[in-house]
């Protein structure tokens, strides 16, 4: 496993840092992404903006795929994802996105993710990703 590519990704992911997101690779293709809902994420006095939740779920889908292909010196980009919101994400709560790759070809990967607040399902999604050589992304 080329752990340096994951470290490089963490260091270069300025958007994830801005939103306060952090992830852990549990195994190739399986990750958890975490974010505490803060004031900067809110659309109402109590609930996160859907875009903040969409960013977390897209990141989790993508990093699950990245963790599957980075040992091949590849990175991924989102082709598409479909998402459902189930409950609001409330201020101060820790959200955990659990994502895994369900299909992996040479170039196309599909992943699924669910965001939880404790045991409450907040959102779910599936996405399709393109894998390509890391040099094309500047790594």
Q: Which residues make up each language-model segment?
A:
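Terminal targeting signals and extreme-terminal segments of soluble enzymes
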Residues: 1-139
């Amino acid at each position: 496993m080329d752990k340096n590519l994951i470290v490089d990704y963490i260091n270069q992911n300025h958007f994830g840092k801005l939103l306060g997101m952090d992830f852990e690779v549990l195994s190739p293709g399986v990750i958890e992404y975490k974010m505490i809902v803060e004031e900067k994420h809110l659309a109402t006095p109590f609930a996160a903006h859907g875009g903040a939740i969409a960013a977390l779920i897209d990141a989790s889908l993508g990093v699950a795929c990245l963790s599957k292909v980075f040992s091949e010196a590849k990175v991924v980009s989102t082709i598409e994802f479909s998402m459902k919101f189930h409950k609001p994400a409330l201020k101060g709560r820790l959200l955990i996105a659990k994502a895994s790759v369900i299909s992996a070809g040479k170039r196309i990967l599909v992943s699924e993710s669910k965001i939880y607040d404790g045991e409450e399902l907040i959102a779910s999604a599936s996405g399709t990703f393109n894998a390509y050589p890391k040099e094309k992304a500047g790594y």
